[in-house]
Amino acid sequence: MRETAVIVPTYNNPKSIKKVAFDVLQNGYELILVDDGSDDVVEELFEDGEKENIYFVRHTTNQGKGEAIISGVKKAKELGYKHVASIDGDGQHLASEIKKLTDAYKDGEILIGARNFDLEHVPNGSKFGRWFSNFWACWDTGFEITDSLSGFRIYPVSILNLPIKTSRFDWEMEVLVRHADAGRVISEVPIECYYPTADERVSHFKKFGDTMAIVWVHVQILPFKWPGFILDKLLGRKRK
């Protein structure tokens, strides 16, 4: 099978998406561009001569980031790929950093590109939200996770077999939990990012609504895990 395709899920990112796409292509990867119901059809933003090595997938209505990634993974599997690198369409993630992940990747795992939030130029955002998400991601999966909200990841195509019920930003949390429940590994490598100005960046993450959706993922899952996790913590056991 082929090794790594790159998926870029996008929804109303007309200012950045072509630059992101060309960055991926210039770094030698085939691109699966998933248009999650954008107002302007993403494929129509590209001239015919610009479409080489790009596979366009379009949702006619907005279905959420999780569904966009799943559609991209299905396309990658159809093309014969074993795993995919997923990066965001807002320009924050650098295609040149994908090699860091592919070099470190081990078959079957989910590998997260972890951002360094201690750098001076990194926006403050919600420090509590990041801490909260990371705490429960570690608790739910048994793995040390420092950037559970990072959209820069490598996924194996086997995630298509996981019983995931969410479809939007909360999907990125649930896929980690379900993957760990299946006995698979989650790892991280540090990455560098570009942080666009407020005028440049288009974000569809709703701080309250999407954060509550992520919380709800844990609320539904945790009651079934408390006895085993408490025992693991008391005995100092870690999931391998």
Which residues make up each language-model segment?
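Donor nucleotide-sugar binding loop of glycosyltransferases
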Residues: 13-16, 38, 65
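A conserved acidic beta->alpha catalytic loop
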Residues: 35-44, 91
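Short beta-strand-to-loop acidic/aromatic patch adjacent to the donor-nucleotide binding site
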Residues: 81-92
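Hydrophobic helical membrane-anchoring modules
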Residues: 1, 15, 142, 164-240
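Short beta-strand/loop segment that forms part of the nucleotide-sugar
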Residues: 21, 29-38, 57-59, 87
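Short loop->beta transition adjacent to catalytic acidic/histidine clusters or analogous donor-positioning motifs
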Residues: 2-4, 24-33, 53-54
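Short, well-formed alpha-helical segments that are part of the catalytic scaffolds
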Residues: 11-26
